[in-house]
Amino acid sequence: VGGSTQALITLAGYVGGAALLLAATLPALPARTIAVIPVALVLNIVIGQVVGAVGLPLYLDSVGTVLVAALAGPVAGLATGTLSSVVWGLLNPAALPFAAVAGATGWLAGWFIRAGAFRTIWRLVVSGLLLGLICGALAAPVAAFVYGGTAGVGTGAIVSLFRELGNSLIGSVTMQSFISDPLDKLAVLAIALAAVKALPKRTLRSLRPGGEEQAAGAPEERAVGVR
């Protein structure tokens, strides 16, 4: 599967999309936001590598992305997710084709959080599940056509189980994604919420869109949808 025409087309489409996303978003970000992106990249890569080595049927490789999205908005989340996969791809080429999906994760997470995902537990749960379903649908073609459904150890085992039950490759990968991704994104949102609550209010105020100029008249917690 890895060298097939389908794989090459899928790879080119997603990598090309990632390049366009970076070109459109990075120049628009303020310096204070760009300064925290490297920290988010390290979080994504380190946590993702550890979880992948353990063999859990999750990823947890978007914690940094969602945290930036919570602090600085959807566009910053999009740039962080995309750049994370590009940088990670230098160490682990398997991450590169997922760059556009990672960018979409950051962008969608930013909008879910802005809409109030962090305000109550039930909103967090619903947002995490919806985010996971959307991201799972986006990632399934990459995992299926580029990697044959074996992009991860733990997730690959679930794909193999569905294959043994007689399902097609794309069907097996999609079902695996609809199991793993909602749980993964729910966990990621919960971790990001805990991190946001632990940060000083001055940090929240300085990183939110508009920065210090909009500090007056709005509580810092509202910048990330926290009550």
Model segments located where?
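Generic transmembrane alpha-helix motif of multi-pass integral membrane proteins
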Residues: 21-23, 61-77, 108-112
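Hydrophobic transmembrane alpha-helices
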Residues: 1-67
